[in-house]
């Protein structure tokens, strides 16, 4: 099981290294618009899971949304501290 900070560090490292086998690197290369569309899609799936599919499926969908939000953060050159300042 990964923690939020651990996942962010792993994703940022893949992007820094330009890992050719990484879907994260590919997503960042596709740009903010494509990532943003994925964030919207995943947010809708979280909502639908919460309404109709129960806690386990909701947790799974939330984890996918958090992943895509982290990818968007990396694409925007934000780090966790940038976000934590606003919590």
From Swiss-Prot:
It comes from the Bacteria. Pathway: Amino-acid biosynthesis; L-histidine biosynthesis; L-histidine from 5-phospho-alpha-D-ribose 1-diphosphate: step 2/9. It is an enzyme of class 3 (hydrolase). Its EC number is 3.6.1.31. GO terms for molecular function: ATP binding; phosphoribosyl-ATP diphosphatase activity. It is found in: Cytoplasm. Its main location: cytoplasm. This is Phosphoribosyl-ATP pyrophosphatase.
